């Protein structure tokens, strides 16, 4: 494997290999091993982010440093992009500086595949438009696998703005490849018009979705949707699709809750549900566990692509 631009066509064996390696790295992060080799020494990794990021950018930075690599942080606002330089020219110039890999986030769907087509260096997609976000999905799947022991046969509902979500797409591809049952839930205006090619079920009633699901992946509601004609109001969305204690207690179903962040508290998810990591209650939040797992998963991706 040379690049990771998406999970759409990634075989189950490759996903399992990455998750198994991530499990090894997670143990080493908890219990440091002095014999652990820094396999990315002298490797330069460019973090090329054309969109804002906290978790993904810092996670890749920390992952690379754990493996002995060095990172170069790129900000579009402080670069020649602000003077009109194209994405392709930016990448070619960084490549000329002997960068070994590009971790790319861009607003345009397909940007990562475009870059992979013009450079001989490794390309990792850190989110491109509404297309894919493969490492986020891998860490979500890793979190589920750690909790349940396996992903195959699980019922996973993806809740919220599925239509515009790269996280949703990558999770659907990865979860389906590993044998999970996947459903989406949200207002009809924020769901796919046709899901036959994806093999997912559709719920427009959140209570029924919770009854069916073992875990819920709650997506960030992009607040501009309320003014873009997709939603009557944020209050209306929260009433019908917000995940809160009242709804969970009504259904009386214990649910594992994931969220890629950042969170719109009291809109897509309540404070109690977002922060609950111990009972009592009908849910368990994995939000911070996801963030921790992201470092190990991205270490596995970097190791596999650059030193494997």
From Swiss-Prot:
Q: Report the top EC class in one word.
A: transferase
- Any idea what job this protein has? Catalyzes the condensation of carbamoyl phosphate and aspartate to form carbamoyl aspartate and inorganic phosphate, the committed step in the de novo pyrimidine nucleotide biosynthesis pathway.
What reaction(s) does this enzyme catalyze? Answer: carbamoyl phosphate + L-aspartate = N-carbamoyl-L-aspartate + phosphate + H(+)
Output the Gene Ontology cellular-component terms.
Answer: cytosol
Instruction: Please list the GO terms describing molecular function.
Output: amino acid binding; aspartate carbamoyltransferase activity
Sequence similarity: Belongs to the aspartate/ornithine carbamoyltransferase superfamily. ATCase family.
Give the GO terms filed under biological process for this record. 'de novo' pyrimidine nucleobase biosynthetic process; 'de novo' UMP biosynthetic process; amino acid metabolic process
Annotated EC: 2.1.3.2
Instruction: Tell me which domain of life the UniProt entry assigns to the organism this sequence originates from.
Output: Bacteria
Establish whether keyword Transmembrane helix is in the entry: no
List positions binding carbamoyl phosphate.
55-56, 105, 133, 136, 261-262
Q: Which InterPro entries match?
A: Asp/Orn_carbamoyltranf_P-bd (IPR006132), Asp/Orn_carbamoylTrfase (IPR006130), Asp/Orn_carbamoylTrfase_sf (IPR036901), Asp_carbamoyltransf (IPR002082), Asp_carbamoyltransf_Asp/Orn-bd (IPR006131)
> Which UniProt keywords are listed?
Pyrimidine biosynthesis, Transferase
Pathway membership of this protein? Answer: Pyrimidine metabolism; UMP biosynthesis via de novo pathway; (S)-dihydroorotate from bicarbonate: step 2/3
Q: Tell me what this protein is called.
A: Aspartate carbamoyltransferase catalytic subunit
Q: Where does L-aspartate bind?
A: 83, 166, 220
Subunit composition and interactions: Heterododecamer (2C3:3R2) of six catalytic PyrB chains organized as two trimers (C3), and six regulatory PyrI chains organized as three dimers (R2).
Q: Which NCBIfam families match?
A: asp_carb_tr (TIGR00670), PRK00856.1 (NF002032)
């Amino acid at each position: 494997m040379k690049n990771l631009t998406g999970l759409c066509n990634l075989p189950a064996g490759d996903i399992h290999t990455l998750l198994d390696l991530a499990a090894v790295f997670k143990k080493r992060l908890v219990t440091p091993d002095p014999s652990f080799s820094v396999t990315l020494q002298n490797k330069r990794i460019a973090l090329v982010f054309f969109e804002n990021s906290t978790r993904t950018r810092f996670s890749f930075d920390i992952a690379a440093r754990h493996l002995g690599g060095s990172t170069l942080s790129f900000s579009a606002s402080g670069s020649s992009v602000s003077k009109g330089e194209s994405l392709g020219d930016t990448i070619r110039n960084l490549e000329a500086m002997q960068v070994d890999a590009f971790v790319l986030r861009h607003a345009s769907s397909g940007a990562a595949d475009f870059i992979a087509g013009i450079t001989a260096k490794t390309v990792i997609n850190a989110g491109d438009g509404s297309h894919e976000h493969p490492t986020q999905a891998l860490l979500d799947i890793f979190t589920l696998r750690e909790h349940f022991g396996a992903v195959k046969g699980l019922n996973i509902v993806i809740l919220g703005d599925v239509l515009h979500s790269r996280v949703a797409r990558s999770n659907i591809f990865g979860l389906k490849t590993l044998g999970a049952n996947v459903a989406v839930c949200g207002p009809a205006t924020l769901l796919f018009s046709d899901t036959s090619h994806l093999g997912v079920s559709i719920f427009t009633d959140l209570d029924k979705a919770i009854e069916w699901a073992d875990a819920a992946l709650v997506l960030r509601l992009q607040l501009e949707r309320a003014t873009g004609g997709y939603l009557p109001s944020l209050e209306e969305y929260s009433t019908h699709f917000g995940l809160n204690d009242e709804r969970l207690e009504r259904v009386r179903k214990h649910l594992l809750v994931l969220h890629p962040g950042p969170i719109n508290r009291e809109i897509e998810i309540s404070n109690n549900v977002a922060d609950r990591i111990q009972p009592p209650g009908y849910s368990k939040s994995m939000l911070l566990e996801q963030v921790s797992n992201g470092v190990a998963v991205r270490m596995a991706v970097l190791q596999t692509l650059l030193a494997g």
